[in-house]
Amino acid sequence: MKSLSLLLAVALGLATAVSAGPAVIECWFVEDTSGKGLAKRPGALLLRQGQGEPPPRPDLDPELYLNVHDPTGFLQAAFRRYPRDAPAPHCEMSRFVPLPASANWASGLTPARNCPRALDGAWLMVSMSSPVLSLSSLLRPQPEPQQEPVLITMATVVLTVLTHTPAPRVRLGQDALLDLSFAYMPPTSEAASSLAAGPPPFGLEWRRQHLGKGHLLLAATPGLNGQMPAAQEGAVAFAAWDDDEPWGPWTGNGTFWLPRVQPFQEGTYLATIHLPYLQGQVTLELAVYKPPKVSLMPATLAWAAPGEAPPELLCLVSHFYPPGGLEVEWELRGGPGGRSQKAEGQRWLSALRHHSDGSVSLSGHLQPPPVTTEQHGARYACRIHHPSLPASGRSAEVTLEVAGLSGPSLEDSIGLFLSAFFLLGLFKALGWAAVYLSTCKDSKKKAE
């Protein structure tokens, strides 16, 4: 009975795993309408269907309602682990034309400049993005939609490029690791037989987008001879096929490592996989951060007489990044009524001070108004909010002491005791010295 229960639990677990993630991805087909700009038409990708027929979609052009066949399982695996509470990915698809890579360093991938006939026909490039992934896939649709039982077009996945870190956040000065993986299956048996056994050569390219131009950071063509551009900024890539099956499918790795990131390195990164006449590209947005430190001056106590203003309070907010998004708030805690409230007084911020590591600092100032006796023991707090901090922010506080209202504290008592002990010892030492000098004088007189 236990074994039956175990088998049932495993079966339910497998069914849950297989059914996880969206079964249909709504997508926009984008095309250029002869110089009139871009036009969009709705489409959909059917990644998985249950038993029976595909669900009908009379609202879609049958050529844009695609029943996706994924020989590598790579695309469907990405969505099986898609979180249920994550927003649906933004999806666009467009026409794709197989061409040799334009970069000189990738010319070894296509010794023959003419595209082989095995790659003739229609191609679609599908790009998806969400907070949990960035993905591009090359699909080869059938020439005509399937008529029965539902109007739908069969499409086969040939190349998929994927990252699970589309928006990495890296602390200033630490290393950035941008994951990239890909999978490829030759589109036809003819294309596979025209190549040598094993995975084909590929090219890996990482660029950072800056002012509308892509700055090449790293390029690699594993297994091919040829002069490659030097890697920039200490970048390293783990570029290799994961397996060497003779006829595919194959998966590969193109993860990118950037040491000790600085603020100038944040921005848009483009990762491109080049195969002979085929390409796939994903986009990542790298953000650099450093949480601020906060301290208050005076450090522990602020003294003031009734009716007088306490000394100016200085809130030091140091070594943070990015400069934007910082908020400095002043609070009075434990005042009249025991509640916290917004502190009154004049307040201002200093200019930013820039540090060699790219972080910045500033100081917030508060000149409190004259105090009353009811405010004795209240605490002035400086609270800061910054994108790198939790929603509650970070704070430091100083206690307000009103002169004439505070009795001796434990520290004061200890100080008085030590002072008295020191004075007692000093008096005894002086007494002994006086006795000694008096004895010496008497001895001299007797000797005379």
UniProtKB/Swiss-Prot annotation:
Signal peptide range in chain numbering: 1-20
Subcellular location per the Swiss-Prot or TrEMBL entry: Endoplasmic reticulum membrane
Family annotation (InterPro entries): Ig-like_dom (IPR007110), Ig-like_dom_sf (IPR036179), Ig-like_fold (IPR013783), Ig_C1-set (IPR003597), Immune_Resp_Modulators (IPR050380), Tapasin (IPR008056)
Lumenal side of membrane: 21-414
Membrane topology: Single-pass type I membrane protein
Domain called Ig-like C1-type: residue spans: 292-399
Principal subcellular localization: endoplasmic reticulum
Keyword Glycosyltransferase applies: no
Transmembrane segments: 415-435
Any Pfam family: C1-set
Keywords: Disulfide bond, Endoplasmic reticulum, Glycoprotein, Immunoglobulin domain, Membrane, Signal, Transmembrane, Transmembrane helix
GO CC annotation terms, alphabetical: endoplasmic reticulum membrane
Disulfide bonds: 27-91, 315-382
Ranges in the topological domain labelled Cytoplasmic: 436-448
BP GO annotations: antigen processing and presentation of endogenous peptide antigen via MHC class I
Glycan-bearing residues: 253
Site entry: May be involved in interaction with TAP: 428
Annotated SUPFAM superfamilies: Immunoglobulin
PROSITE patterns: IG_LIKE (PS50835)
Task of the protein: Involved in the association of MHC class I with transporter associated with antigen processing (TAP) and in the assembly of MHC class I with peptide (peptide loading).
Subunit structure of this chain's protein: Heterodimer with PDIA3; disulfide-linked. Obligatory mediator for the interaction between newly assembled MHC class I molecules, calreticulin, PDIA3 and TAP. Up to 4 MHC class I/tapasin complexes bind to 1 TAP. Interacts with HLA-G-B2M complex; this interaction is required for loading of high affinity peptides. On its own or as part of MHC class I peptide loading complex, interacts with ligand-free MR1 or MR1-B2M complex, providing for stable MR1 pools ready for metabolite antigen processing.
Note on domains (UniProt): The N-terminus is required for efficient association with MHC class I molecule and for a stable interaction between MHC I and calreticulin. Binding to TAP is mediated by the C-terminal region.
UniProt protein name: Tapasin
Biological source species: Chlorocebus aethiops (Green monkey)
Encoding gene per record: TAPBP
